Amino acid sequence: NYNIGVDFEPQKSVSHSLLSDAPEDQLERSVMNFSPTVNFRYKFSKRTRLQIVYRGKGKQPNIRDLQPVTDRTNPLNIRVGNPSLKPSYMNTFTLNFNSYNTKYQRNMVATALFENTINNVTNQVTYDSETGVRTTSPVNMNGNWRAMGSFSLNTPFKNRNWIFRTYSYLQYRNQNGYTTLNKEEPVKTSVQHLTGRERLRITYRTRQMELTGLVGLTYNNSYNDVREKRTETFDYQAGTELQLYLPWGMELYNDLTYFLRTGYGYEGYAKANFMWNCQLSKAFLKRKQLLIRFKIYDILHQDISMIRTITATAIRDTDYNALGSYFMVHAILRLNMMGK
């Protein structure tokens, strides 16, 4: 079956700019946002399904970007609004396939996505090498899109005590922007970013315990066509998880993971570390509705907290102070409000 729908959302915004050295400036906009949806579902069998969805969504620029005001709060990073910005429109196509085999207890999920934005709002950056000042102004630009696919499989072996899980992910993203050096003509910049990820898990399960071994790899490849520069990073991980079912309804859980990163320019992040967490829990009450859990995080004090952000104009590594080793006590109460 299928469904077709559309949303209309009228929107009006009024902005007043009050500056000490200029008369009051008023910016008023009235628009109609248009968002269509098409949803197609096909059932091959009771447990095998396909879903295809299209969604369109209009989005208006925010007031801060539209205001014709120069923000000099940070003298080295000046921001100038653009009242000529147009609304952006995003197209999203999604495909989902799910199949479950009850005989072999095998579950398979595949997903694909394509997304592009018309009149996407991006930043035009002008850099003055003499003063070190960056001036940023929002502009409309086309050509920003991404495509993504993922696949997961969960299946037991012939010996049902063994379970195999895999997850694969691939994404390609194209980001456009403008940059200017020393007030010259703006130059269009484009960054192509490829991300690949693979996770494998094997679990051995008995009535007394569950033991899991896992490995993973994340690959990132970014290319900037202005500087003609390519960067590659590899994130490896390997670890184990152990859950023991103890007497008196208690459970002990440990997870230990080894991380190795290569290709990063920041030496503090491009190093190996271990992450070890441990928790002890017990259920109470007649139907075990109350769960008390004591968990210790980062026992070895080796956590590294860093985020890499890739845009059309820059690659930015942000390092955060990690919280360090700490513990938490959880009390979880499950209530059934629907009765028996």
Language model regions located:
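Exposed, low-structure sequence patches enriched in small/polar residues
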Residues: 1-340
